[in-house]
From Swiss-Prot:
One of its GO terms (biological process) is protein catabolic process. This is Leucine aminopeptidase 2. Its cofactor is Zn(2+). Gene3D superfamilies: 3.30.2010.30, Neutral Protease Domain 2, Peptidase M1, leukotriene A4 hydrolase/aminopeptidase C-terminal domain, tricorn interacting facor f3 domain. SUPFAM superfamilies: ARM repeat, Leukotriene A4 hydrolase N-terminal domain, Metalloproteases ('zincins'), catalytic domain. Keywords: Cytoplasm, Hydrolase, Metal-binding, Metalloprotease, Nucleus, Protease, Zinc. Zn(2+) binds at H300, H304, E323. Its main location: cytoplasm. GO terms for cellular component: cytosol; fungal-type vacuole lumen; multivesicular body; nucleus; NVT complex. A peptide binds at Q139, C140, Q141, P271, Y272, G273, G274, M275, E276.
Length: 618
């Protein structure tokens, strides 16, 4: 009897999840900071989806050390299949006999992570904000959970999870914390931390972090967790908007399903923006800007609590169903809080990111399509703003086509039909057409839509008509500055930007960076002084102003730029700032890198090495 290793919907898993479905995972791990590994076991409850026809279980696994495997408590035969890159070496477990349809078995696997684990990052005390303790966090999206423990590593399977984690330092996981048992004492200086995830989630949302972590309330159902020295400023940054955001999206979709919505602010060397791990969003500290203006990322990660986490793409080929929907809902939250013009402003910024990504890949590249072909490919290689922004523009087009009022009725319907499930683009299309089937006008418009072009054509989609009111004022200001390098009566003053949001100032600075002829050092200094940009606590703003000043050859920004490089490790800021700095003063750039390289995450450090030195041994 043939067992298919490649199930029909997800080409990026080696598991035979068409024969078995994991319904529950118990994860028991010790965090060993000195050895930089997790040691323990996982128990999978697997339900048979055939009537005794499958006599083997195949799980994804990559660079994990497996001790033994038991089926319902009895030792079982197992082997690791030859590696098939980039998917790892599948774990094949033999059964003595098949299992009846819908009956379950428990598969217990003792496991250790190895130094080749791609999901876990281990930070030294030097890479944290108060420099006192080591830190560990996971990032399992897209196919990295299999490097922590063997599993059905596909978004097409969802399981409930119990976490039992021992660590000498506080632990965060993607489940509801058992707060009365948190840190229950255990021997050898370790405590046991327990979390329960009662909503079934895919493997990529399995998340762990451990380090010197404190918590503070930011709403009636929310806490922020971060380093004790940063907890108050993080609380201030997030407490004004978090519950407001939750209330806004609950009106658009339906009530929040996860109990608590919390935010873990990671150490400053975290190289990314954010990750939507359920119950605890993992976020970059660069959103803590002391002006509450960088928290759009929280609206985005919160929106994932519906799109992605509850209703999930069946494979990474349909990633737009996660990210396009989430970007659409994020902007609906922003519209509810800041007004409709702000949604369009955010979409205009997104359109620029989309055009940049299409330019990067090339207009006819496979990865610029809404539905991508990822057979034999690593989903991480396809990652870009395209599923976010092309996906958003498709949904915005559908909203415009049928009318916002009608589309608003479809939103909760869609998220109800697929709640707790995974779907592909074809099911999305069928559900949309079915919902509007009794509305002759909307039905005709949707049936006449060129679905194949939207789904399969590479490159940019048609550009929508956006409300440009919030960018027009910014473009006008940029034009005035451009005229200063010629002859102009324009006299810059603080009132030019007093009514602008931080995001508008970001767009203004991006426009200034596009000037063919850079500002003079004098004008750069004038801008920094008059607008207060040189002292901005908002890293999005400060980073761009320093790039602008360096491009202008303004020596006044060198010191603050190097100081910024010593306190943030997000690659979005670090790489362009080093590139700008080395063009002005390579000696300072190299010295700054040597001074702070141990602070940076290894991925960031390697990238900056390449930027500064080309290829050399790290």
């Amino acid at each position: 009897m043939a067992i298919s290793i490649h199930p029909p919907r997800d080409p990026n898993t080696l598991s035979n999840y068409n024969n078995w479905i994991c319904t529950h995972i118990t994860a028991n791990f010790d965090i060993l900071f000195d050895q930089k590994k997790l040691v323990g076991n996982v128990i999978h409850k697997l339900k048979s989806t055939t009537n005794g026809e499958s006599q083997e279980i195949i799980l994804d696994s990559n660079h994990v050390a497996i001790g033994d495997v038991k089926i319902d408590g009895r030792p079982s035969e197992w082997e690791l299949l030859p590696p098939l890159e980039p998917y790892g070496s599948a774990l094949k477990i033999k059964l003595d006999q098949g299992v009846n349809l819908n009956e379950t078995i428990d598969v217990e696997i003792s496991v250790q992570t190895t130094e080749k684990c791609t999901a876990l990052q281990w930070l030294t005390p030097a890479q944290t904000s108060n420099k006192k303790h080591p830190y560990m966090f996971s990032q399992c999206q897209a196919i990295h959970a299999r490097s922590i423990f063997p599993c059905q590593d596909t978004p097409d399977v969802k399981s409930t999870i119990d976490f039992n984690i021992s660590s000498p330092l506080p632990v965060i996981a993607s489940g509801l914390p058992v707060r009365d048992a948190l840190g229950a004492s255990k021997s050898e200086g370790k405590s046991l931390y327990q979390f329960h995830q009662r909503v079934p989630i895919p493997s990529y949302l399995f998340a762990l972090a451990s380090g010197d972590i404190s918590e503070a309330a930011i709403g009636p159902r929310s806490v922020v967790a971060t380093s004790p020295d940063k907890v108050q400023e993080c609380q201030w940054e997030l407490e004004a908007d978090t519950e407001k955001f939750i209330g806004a999206i609950e009106k658009i979709v339906y009530p929040y399903a996860w109990g608590e919505y919390n935010v873990l602010i990671l150490p400053p060397s975290f190289p990314y923006g954010g990750m939507e791990n359920p119950i605890f969003t993992f976020a970059t500290p660069s959103i803590i800007s002391k002006d509450r203006e960088n928290i759009d990322v929280i609206a985005h990660e919160l929106a994932h609590s519906w799109s992605g986490n509850l209703v999930t793409n069946a494979s990474w080929e349909h990633f737009w169903l996660n990210e396009g929907w989430t970007t659409y809902l994020e902007r609906r939250i922003l519209a509810a809080v800041h007004g409709e013009a702000y949604r369009h402003f955010s979409a205009i910024i997104g359109w620029k990111a989309l055009t940049d990504s299409v330019e990067h890949f090339g207009h006819d590249h496979e990865f610029t399509k809404l539905i991508t072909d990822l057979k034999g490919k690593d989903p991480d290689d396809a990652f870009s703003s395209i599923p976010y922004e092309k996906g958003f523009n498709f949904l915005f087009h559908l909203e415009t086509l049928v009318g916002k009022q009608k589309f608003d009725r479809f939103i909760p319907h869609y998220f109800t039909v697929f709640k707790g499930k995974s779907l592909d683009s074809y099911e999305f299309k069928a559900t949309l057409l079915d919902f509007f089937g009794t509305d002759a006008e909307a039905s005709k418009l949707l049936n006449d839509l060129d679905w194949d072009t939207w789904f399969y054509a590479p490159g940019l989609p048609p550009k929508p008509q956006f409300d440009t009111s919030l960018v027009d004022v910014v473009y006008e200001l940029a034009q005035k500055w451009k005229s200063l390098s010629e002859t102009s009566s324009f006299k810059p003053q603080l009132s030019d930007i007093e009514s602008l949001s931080a995001n508008q100032i970001v767009v203004f600075l991006e426009q200034m960076l596009l000037l063919e002829r850079p500002l003079t050092p004098e004008l750069s200094k004038l801008m920094g002084e008059v607008y207060g940009l040189s002292k901005s606590e908002n890293i999005e703003v400060a980073n761009l102003y320093f790039q602008l000043g360096l491009k202008a050859g303004d020596e006044n920004v060198v010191d603050p730029a190097t100081e910024l490089l010593g306190r943030i490790g997000r690659m979005k800021f670090v790489r362009p700032l080093f590139r700008s700095l080395q063009r002005v003063n390579r000696e300072v750039a190299v010295a700054t890198f040597e001074k702070y390289k141990d602070f940076y995450h290894p991925i960031c450090r390697a990238m900056v090495e390449k930027d500064l030195f080309g290829k050399r041994d790290v």
